[in-house]
């Protein structure tokens, strides 16, 4: 139980620090909040709603991971370095993939809601 409490404290600190220092984290948190409301209108069912919100939470989680990668890379060497740039680009690509997944799920839900898909 003590480990769970400690892990929760660490997570809360990470969320707070992310909100304070990272515009991308704030942007994607707003996306989740807007999605919570918009999803109620678009989602064809409760299952679709859960999937839609789940994909937005995945985007936010991947952004936190990407932020961690960038912070660590900057700590290792604040100078420009080709390998560090590649590592940061991989993290950015992961965010792009998660955003693409969210877009696909949301567009599919909208198509189902509009009767364009079964």
Positions of the model-derived regions?
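Hydrophobic alpha-helical transmembrane segments
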Residues: 2-68, 76, 80-82, 88, ...
């Amino acid at each position: 139980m003590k480990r769970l409490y400690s892990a929760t404290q660490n997570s809360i600190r990470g969320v707070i620090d992310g909100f304070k220092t990272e515009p991308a984290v704030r942007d994607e948190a707003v996306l989740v909040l807007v999605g919570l409301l918009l999803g109620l209108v678009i989602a064809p069912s409760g299952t679709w709603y859960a999937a839609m919100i789940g994909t937005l939470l995945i985007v936010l989680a991947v952004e936190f991971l990407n932020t961690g990668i960038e912070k660590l890379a900057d700590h290792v060497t604040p100078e420009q370095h080709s390998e560090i740039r590649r590592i940061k680009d991989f993290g950015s690509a992961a965010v792009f993939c998660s955003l693409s997944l969210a877009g696909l799920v949301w567009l599919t839900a909208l198509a189902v809601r509009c009767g364009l898909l079964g």
